[in-house]
Design a protein with these regions (language model features):
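NTP-dependent nucleotidyl-transfer catalytic core
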Residues: 1-127
Length: 127
């Protein structure tokens, strides 16, 4: 069985040293230990924090360049933009339909997001 790694960065701004040290560099080093590596630009995730399409598009370019400048070899790794793969949204819809709210309540990312916005406690989950 092939060993695979998957990671991505949300495209919400200009890449910085924290992105490089905390995500890009470790992911590229770790990829050497795997048969296949998948790196993606999480532009759908960015919509949660920024509704300006132009800013997100610029961030996608900046972060893609940061990955490539840091040594990502697009001939050896799969490198893609989240919005270019429609099956991601389809799978997300299916998972949303079968995932219990209790599981989300235990998620650190979900708890942090809801703590920041008490006026919309579940971030639009129940609409």
């Amino acid at each position: 069985m092939k060993k695979r790694i998957l990671t991505g960065i949300t495209t919400t701004g200009t890449p910085h040293i924290g992105n490089y040290l905390g995500a890009i560099k470790p992911a590229l080093e770790l990829a050497n230990d795997f048969d296949e590596s998948f790196f993606f630009l999480a532009d759908y995730h960015a919509i949660i924090k920024n509704s300006n399409n132009n800013e997100i598009a610029e961030s996608v370019k900046s972060i893609a360049l940061a990955w490539l400048a840091s040594g990502l070899d697009s001939k050896k790794s799969f490198f893609y933009r989240q919005s270019d793969v429609p099956e991601i949204l389809e799978l997300s819809w299916i998972l949303n339909c079968v995932t219990a709210k209790g599981l989300m309540n235990r998620s650190h990312a979900y708890k942090a997001a809801t703590a920041l916005n008490s006026s919309d406690e579940d971030k639009g989950i129940t609409m």
